Regions:
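A generic structural signal for short, non-catalytic loop/turn and secondary-structure boundary residues
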Residues: 15-18, 56, 63-65, 73, ...
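Active-site acidic/histidine clusters and adjacent loop/turn architecture
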Residues: 30-120
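Short beta-strand/turn micro-motifs at beta-sheet edges
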Residues: 9, 66-70, 147-151
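Single conserved hydrophobic/aromatic residue that forms the stacking wall/gate
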Residues: 1-7, 12
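Short secondary-structure junctions and interdomain/linker hinges
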Residues: 9, 48-52, 109, 145, ...
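Loop-rich catalytic cores of soluble enzymes, especially ATP-dependent carboxylate-amine ligases
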Residues: 118-189
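Hydrophobic alpha-helical membrane-insertion signals
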Residues: 13-41
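Glycine-rich, often proline-containing surface loops adjacent to acidic residues and nearby aromatics
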Residues: 18-23, 72-88, 153-164
Length: 189
């Protein structure tokens, strides 16, 4: 753990990255944000912070800047896919910068974000499927393979950590450490 905190030789070679999803909601009625809201947010992020648009079927479905991207998830969740970085401090800085940019843009629209794993109050019908061909295909497939697939797509978020590894044994070691510290991380947050 200490090696990744301070950027030891191993972590200078190997990189870590995070994927951070969040739900947007309107402050006035605590309802989910719409596709139109997301289009405004993404457009303003481009103009104010120099993100580049990713377009599909004339809709902005994501943004990119250097090795970082912001994507639109099936139920309107917004995800930061971070760049590969040297240590946890850099990924923390990256997530904080993203949240600061998002908050600055969304303040004008009275939109805020929450980091919650699952939405207990909003129903599937409250969350419109986002305009990505992939999600259209997934939304037809998920009900065929289980009862909660659509809920997973539209009503959940996660934070994922991605670790480079040099070999299978290196991957096993990192996986064991990550699993061992997971209860501590959960307790902290």
């Amino acid at each position: 753990i200490a090696e990744c905190l301070v950027g030891s030789e191993m972590c200078i070679r190997d990189r870590i990255g995070t994927e951070h999803e969040k739900f947007g909601f309107k402050k006035k009625d605590l309802r989910p944000i719409s596709v139109d809201d997301i289009q405004k947010i993404f457009s303003e992020l481009c103009s104010k912070y120099k993100w580049e648009k990713i377009i599909e079927s004339s809709k902005i479905i994501g943004l990119k800047k250097d090795a970082t991207s912001i994507t639109l998830e099936p139920g309107g969740q917004i995800e930061l896919s971070g760049a590969p970085v040297k240590n946890l401090f850099e990924t923390c800085k990256e997530v904080n910068l993203h949240q600061d940019e998002l908050n600055a843009v969304c303040r004008n629209y009275e939109i805020e974000f929450m980091g919650i794993g699952v939405l207990p109050k909003w129903k599937l019908s409250d969350l419109k499927l986002m305009p990505k061909k992939r999600y259209e295909i997934m939304s037809k497939y998920m009900p065929l393979v289980g009862e909660m697939g659509l809920d997973m797509m539209k009503r959940t978020t996660t934070i994922q950590a991605n670790f480079d590894f040099a070999s299978e044994s290196d991957m096993k070691k990192k996986f064991r450490v990550a699993q061992s510290i997971q209860p501590v991380i959960i307790a902290l947050y």
